[in-house]
Amino acid sequence: MNPSFFLTVLCLGVASAAPKLDPNLDAHWHQWKATHRRLYGMNEEEWRRAVWEKNKKIIDLHNQEYSEGKHGFRMAMNAFGDMTNEEFRQVMNGFQNQKHKKGKLFHEPLLVDVPKSVDWTKKGYVTPVKNQGQCGSCWAFSATGALEGQMFRKTGKLVSLSEQNLVDCSRAQGNQGCNGGLMDNAFQYIKDNGGLDSEESYPYLATDTNSCNYKPECSAANDTGFVDIPQREKALMKAVATVGPISVAIDAGHTSFQFYKSGIYYDPDCSSKDLDHGVLVVGYGFEGTDSNNNKFWIVKNSWGPEWGWNGYVKMAKDQNNHCGIATAASYPTV
């Protein structure tokens, strides 16, 4: 990655005062609480309800504008409904610069005519969508996703790999568990360690309070290093087409992303430099009949299958590196 970004997480803060609530939304609120198993103290419930109502209004207004053709994607209420955008960014995202070892540089194949669309989920390269929970471990999920794809390419077998192994054991390489990390640091740990355990043998706990429990006999993957991709969408496209799923970092801190549901995500406020979330590009394509318009990246997130488009997001492609999708792309070598 160049420049490097450190994906991290901060503490959750809760404000106290709450404005007047809309009684017409009582049934919707109680249904949302039941769906997401929320239980609050008396003082907190009013505040959370007020935050939820504000988010619902933002979502409803956006979708009204979507129906008028002003946006290319829909939003929907989800598990983040009772979080302010500031809390959402603090819990799920955040970054700081960090020096780290550089990988090999990706050399774009010159004589390869890449296809107009690619979807590695249809080729067996991608495990089901996972959920990082209230832990800033997006970097680990992005890293395992890329390695799962490369191991499938090499062996023909798709094995879910252990994010918890990375969370617990890669601090020496510069990662900080639930407080953040880098995909390249994860790839370096796997090389240094000589392997990574399977998800089945080392299940995810969404916490970083345990000591490293790597078991060599349960190792299901290894890598020999990693490759950094030049900061261009054309280079990323060639890598996705010829290599497989690619780890990337994006600016995911906007309310529009917090409540993304479907369509091609584009937010004019999205930064190509202020990256705060690690995800996995598993393909690209276009909507309609014109392959030069409505282009998108297929991105696997780690917020569970209920978020977004069954856990995925279509992100605008060839729109000046929108949200920084090509700024910090890399993959492991096996």
Swiss-Prot record:
Positions of the record's site feature: Cleavage: F106, H107, E108, V112, D113, V114
Entry similarity comment: Belongs to the peptidase C1 family.
Compartments it resides in: Lysosome; Apical cell membrane; Cytoplasmic vesicle, Secretory vesicle, Chromaffin granule; Secreted, Extracellular space
Binding site for Zn(2+) 6: D274
Active site: C138, H277, N301
Record-linked SMART domains: Inhibitor_I29, Pept_C1
Recorded name of the encoding gene: CTSL
Subunit organization: Dimer of a heavy and a light chain linked by disulfide bonds. Interacts with Long isoform of CD74/Ii chain; the interaction stabilizes the conformation of mature CTSL.
Annotated catalysed reactions: Specificity close to that of papain. As compared to cathepsin B, cathepsin L exhibits higher activity toward protein substrates, but has little activity on Z-Arg-Arg-NHMec, and no peptidyl-dipeptidase activity
Tissues expressed in: Expressed by neuroendocrine chromaffin cells.
Annotated GO MF terms: cysteine-type endopeptidase activity; endopeptidase activity; metal ion binding
Membrane topology annotation: Peripheral membrane protein
Binding-site residues for Zn(2+) 5, renumbered to this chain: D251, H254
Signal peptide (from-to): 1-17
Propeptide position ranges: 18-117, 290-291
Presence of keyword Amino-acid biosynthesis: no
Keywords: Cell membrane, Cytoplasmic vesicle, Disulfide bond, Glycoprotein, Hydrolase, Lysosome, Membrane, Metal-binding, Protease, Secreted, Signal, Thiol protease, Zinc, Zymogen
Xref: Pfam families: Inhibitor_I29 (PF08246), Peptidase_C1 (PF00112)
Matching InterPro entries: Papain-like_cys_pep_sf, Pept_asp_AS, Pept_cys_AS, Pept_his_AS, Peptidase_C1A, Peptidase_C1A_C, Peptidase_C1A_papain-like, Prot_inhib_I29
Main location: other
Taxonomic superkingdom: Eukaryota
Annotated EC: 3.4.22.15
Residues the record lists as binding Zn(2+) 7: D276
SUPFAM superfamilies: Cysteine proteinases
Record note on modification: During export along the endocytic pathway, pro-CTSL undergoes several proteolytic cleavages to generate the CTSL single-chain and two-chain mature forms, composed of a heavy chain linked to a light chain by disulfide bonds. Autocleavage; produces the single-chain CTSL after cleavage of the propeptide. The cleavage can be intermolecular.
GO cellular component terms attached to this protein's record: apical plasma membrane; chromaffin granule; extracellular space; lysosome
UniProt name for this protein: Procathepsin L
